[in-house]
UniProtKB/Swiss-Prot annotation:
Molecular function, one GO term: DNA binding
UniProt organism field: Aspergillus rugulosus (Emericella rugulosa)
Gene3D superfamilies: Zn(2)-C6 fungal-type DNA-binding domain (4.10.240.10)
Gene behind the chain: ecdB
Main location per the UniProt record: nucleus
Superkingdom to which the source organism belongs: Eukaryota
Start-end of DNA-binding region: 12-39
Region (Disordered): 79-99
Record keywords, A-Z: DNA-binding, Metal-binding, Nucleus, Transcription, Transcription regulation, Zinc
Location(s) in or outside the cell: Nucleus
GO cellular component, as recorded: nucleus
Protein's name in the database: Putative transcription factor ecdB
InterPro entries membership: EcdB-like_regulator, Zn2-C6_fun-type_DNA-bd_sf, Zn2Cys6_DnaBD
Amino acid sequence: MVKMRKRLAVACDACRSRRVKCDGQRPSCMGCLSRGLDCSYQRLPEPPATRLETELANVNMRLDYLAMLLSRQSQPQAPPPVLLASARPSSNPLSSHEDSPFRLLATDSIMSVLGLEDHFARRLVQLERASLLASTTTLSRMFFISHQQVTDALIAFSERVHTFYPILPLDFSERYFATLSGPLAPSCQTCLALLVAAIGCIARDPTMGDEYFEAALASLPTVLAECTLASIQCLVFLSIYYCCRLKPCQAHDYCLIASFKIQNLFKSELSVQLDVATSDTWKLDEYIPLPNCRYTWQFSCPPLPGNLAGVSPESASSSSSSISIDSTNSSTSTASDQAQSFFLAEIAMRRMLHRCNSAVAQSSDGRFCYAPSIALELERQLEEWYDYLPASIRFVREPAGGSFNGDQSALSPLSTFLNVQYCCCKLSIYWPAVYQVIQDDKATPQLLEHCQRFIDSYVQLLPRIALAIDKCLIYKWTLSVTFFVTTMAALKVANTAALRAAQHERLHESLALAGTVGWKNTEDSPSLELLRLNLSQHLREAKQK
């Protein structure tokens, strides 16, 4: 143990200024007493906390967090704390801005502007939480595993899910088939293989996959107890499973647990890598437990598209031997480059989505109003983001007033999702102009021009988001809520008298098309069912006017 050096004698201020030796006596040293001087000492700094004290403080913090979670479980009928916090006035100065009607988000203020009932947004959360308490399942691990079914599930998982979250190791195919051919003993590897099978079955048929998921839940205590890379992968895929099942609250809960485990894993890794000179931190050594982003799993499928009858676990695991090494490395490199390009573009897009509602200025009397110069700058940054997109994830940017190109249905799910975010960002940039007109009940030429840009953005968004809801399985619930909010906002524009001078022909055509968009496979989500019924009612009322 390293002993900290303690300084017992400290010179007083008078002796220090005169640069003479001080005996350190309290309250007055002998030198000051003999000379009749005021003797005062500087206050010693508090010693830093020891490692043991720091660890104990962290343990107490985690125990307090667990106690809070247990107290919530003991009161299942109480509304979530976030709802209680939003029900009363908050002292946080940001809360009023985040719930501002200038921000096109699913908040109470926006729902009120769009003509919906009070606390409509919170009712969606309450419906999802209530469905969680009602949907209790019994675990059943005894079921027959078809090799053909798990192979088809792995192919569907690779095509529709893994492109968004490429976090599996290179040898996952071998582990997957070996695990599902074994006794399914509770472990993180068993849970991971069963979750991939469950998600893949949902990707092929939304009515399948329950038996694999129920079997995976038998390993949940092990997953929660461990803090390994495999346990984090299981928690991420548990969140993805609930996203595919349109249960956002459960998905969010497991995502939070995974986030805490990732932070702990990084802390433990950094603590053993402090000896930088001898560590492999800068070498990206493959033996370090942290994940490596350079190589991820890719499922190489030799048969023709649509013909899965000839696929077997043996052919899937040995397909690399039938393909040349150069072509395999090329396809893996291309997929890896596409994934990395997507995540870089997604990070930049998320930052823009956080500030795309900021085209608002505060006047001298404290009133918020639309700031057109900020909106134009935000749109310039958005176009600059598009110009930097690589060809592997680039989508076709339609000009204002242009028609939708049906060939975009051949885009990858990654490009389709980015395309929707691009249009949503434009909508959010110019929504403050629309709300300014609604608030003032009049439109200046500049406001009218920017409201027209909002209309053009919605016209471009509608066919793309309808396509993305079917293609982007993981984000189906999020995209459905976005479709509802943006369509309700477009209805508000169409019914605003001050905006009649804008070109509404294509807007009315798009709203008529929105009424034909099917909410497929959303029956199990009470919140989406409520959104569907409300949107259908408002579209019918608008059509009758």
